[in-house]
Amino acid sequence: MACKHLPFLALAGVLLAYLCSQSEAASNFDCCLTYTKNVYHHARNFVGFTTQMADEACDINAIIFHLKSKRSVCADPKQIWVKRILHLLSLRTKKM
């Protein structure tokens, strides 16, 4: 009787191992954990941005600014300076 269930148990084990590896992969995202304390006044050093939403992978909402120096800056989307830089970047892309 046990031999009848062995293929099913083996398949269930493989499926469980696959699902566990997928959930680990989802947690490997680079998320902003804190916001920068610096205030940036000029958009000239920024080349773009990414929006991070708080969901299963990341804990906080953030704007990730990408700088010419290949660095990234995590900013609070509620801050006035962040909204101003986003506006300036959108104007820059409309001109292109």
UniProtKB/Swiss-Prot annotation:
Which Gene Ontology molecular function entries are recorded, alphabetically?
CCR6 chemokine receptor binding; chemokine activity; cytokine activity
Recorded name of the encoding gene: Ccl20
Q: In which tissues is it expressed?
A: Low levels in thymus and lung.
Protein name as annotated: C-C motif chemokine 20
Quick one: a GO biological-process term for this protein?
Answer: thymocyte migration
Keyword set includes Secreted: yes
Pfam family for this entry, one: IL8
Query: What induces this one?
Result: By TNF in experimental allergic panencaphalomyelitis (EAP) and by TNF and IL-1 in primary astrocytes.
